[in-house]
Curated annotation (Swiss-Prot):
It comes from Oryza sativa subsp. japonica. Keywords: ATP-binding, Cell cycle, Cell division, Cytoplasm, Cytoskeleton, Kinase, Mitosis, Nucleotide-binding, Nucleus, Phosphoprotein, Serine/threonine-protein kinase, Transferase. The gene is CDKB2-1. The active site is at D159 (proton acceptor). This is Cyclin-dependent kinase B2-1. Expressed in the dividing region of the root apex and the intercalary meristem of internodes. Interacts with CYCB2-1 and CYCB2-2. Binding to CYCB2-1 or CYCB2-2 activates CDK kinase. Residues 28-318 form the Protein kinase domain.
Length: 326
């Protein structure tokens, strides 16, 4: 992992490296499987000593030459730094050992959240209910705040999507999770692999093969999530990289050098059908003028023109949010 410029005090996390799986299961009782993340299974569990309900993420990864699963350890390192923020899921503990096959097993112990944004949106869609406008606003404010915190610490998430945004149904608290693909970024920008992100929330520069990208990739994802909160439907639902680009171009207009200088030099650029841009207000119903303005600023083609998460928090759309609560 690249060096982080903004080192913060690490959250207190105890690490156990002896006893392996047996030891972890002595401490926690699995209650139910609640999902599978990109890199492992997630269980709702009870800490035997305290009765506290936690989320237990079991990760078994191929090891590198040094015997360390790099993706999981990257996630741990980032979470230790980012856990201090109320909008990033808190890493409580870490257990490491080996299973019977000699593979490294990591149990990451997180605070438990009872749902995620994907389930929350799906429940409203199935009930034919729109998410209330004030709820959309407080969820979006928390998302922008969490992303701004990560970016301020030099971390790109790179896989923001409703499934990775955990929620508390009662309080409407929202927390960013699944930092397994995150990267610290430095200046000048590094070349990054573009085999990342769920297609629907993937920024156009990544789809077009850009090797250099930065925080605006997360902002594009935030904009897609914003539109989905307003409509209960994904804004760009492609099933391949080409289809995803065509969905975007059809709605926002096919980009050119005037709109996005350098776009035709990107590796995956071809001659695409020419579509004229639609108004965002025609695409996303249920948002007021301030909300539409913010959404437009998030979905700019040229990455450098996208609003930052920090600036988004200061947008007039959030003027009536009680920021002390979040």
């Amino acid at each position: 992992m690249a060096a982080l410029h903004h080192q913060a005090a690490a959250a207190p996390v105890t690490t156990t490296t002896d006893g392996g799986e047996l030891r972890a299961m002595d401490l926690y009782e699995k209650l139910e499987k609640v999902g599978e993340g990109t890199y492992g299974k997630v269980y709702k569990a009870r800490e035997k000593a305290t009765g506290r309900i936690v989320a237990l993420k079991k990760t078994r990864l191929p090891e590198d030459d040094e015997g360390v699963p790099p993706t999981a350890l990257r996630e741990v390192s980032l979470l230790r730094m980012l856990s201090q923020d109320s909008h990033v899921v808190r890493l409580l503990d870490l257990k490491q050992g080996q299973n019977k096959e000699g593979q490294t097993i990591l149990y990451l112990v997180f605070e438990y959240m009872d749902t995620d944004l994907k389930k929350f949106i799906r429940a409203h869609r199935q009930n034919l209910q729109k998410i209330p406008v004030p709820t959309v606003k407080i969820l979006m404010y928390q998302l922008c705040k969490g992303v701004a915190f990560c970016h301020g610490r030099g971390v790109l998430h790179r896989d923001l999507k409703p499934h990775n945004l955990l929620m508390d149904r009662k309080t409407m608290a929202l927390k960013i999770a699944d930092l397994g693909l995150s990267r610290s970024f430095t200046v000048p920008l590094k070349k990054y692999t573009h085999e990342i992100l769920t297609l629907w929330y993937r920024a156009p520069e990544v789809l077009l093969g850009a090797a250099h990208y930065s925080t605006p990739v997360d902002i594009w994802s935030v904009g897609c999530i914003f539109a989905e909160l307003a409509t209960n439907q994904p804004l760009f639902a492609g099933d391949s990289e080409v289809q995803q680009l065509l969905h975007i171009f059809k709605l926002l207009g096919t980009p050119n050098e005037q709109v996005w200088p350098g776009v035709s030099k990107l590796p995956n650029w071809h001659e695409y059908p020419q579509w004229n841009p639609s108004k965002v207000s025609d695409l996303v119903h249920g948002l007021d003028a301030d909300a539409l303005d913010l959404l437009e600023k998030m979905l700019q083609y040229e990455p450098s023109k996208r609003i930052s998460a920090k600036k988004a928090m200061e947008h007039p759309y959030f003027n009536d949010v009680n920021k002390e609560l979040y």
